[in-house]
């Protein structure tokens, strides 16, 4: 069983990223030429130090040392962007490449609009090209990983690049596995406790995010507090109690 998101796959020789100049063979609109070929990164949220508090919603959880969250006070902005993306890519947004992104335009480290099997468009980052017809992607606003075909991708136009990446990678402060790695049961237990829920986060520190591939993103180290009516509950304490019963 895989406890955490992997996002990477085996290296494949002869990927699309090795093509010298696909613009010679494709009619590329000037706006796409500027945005897609230069791999301009999306903006990211920056956080002050030292200790501070945030209202967060956990969007995905692998284990206590690897989970992602969104800021609750940014949810309205993300929902507005997602709504606009659905309308745009259902019509003129896909008109440049009606059959999907040409394989020659698929690049590691570039951002695209990706059409998921749930019939929703998302902002995605290509982490690895797995051959000419498959890409490993990271859903930058939700912290999820997946695989997509070029036919499921479209250019991410400038109007959808202004909002900073909304999924932030994090870990619980002072929590380590009893052994070298988290067990599958511990991973499942942690996910059941936090996934999809809102907490008060007490941020203890930060470091560069080396997991997601998002340029200049930060990884936050925090305590998660469930502000229940009967009193504050620390997630790490609940997790320790549940693990003792496994």
Question: What is the predicted role of each segment?
Answer:
Residues 1-246:
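Intrinsically disordered, low-complexity segments and flexible domain linkers enriched for serine/proline
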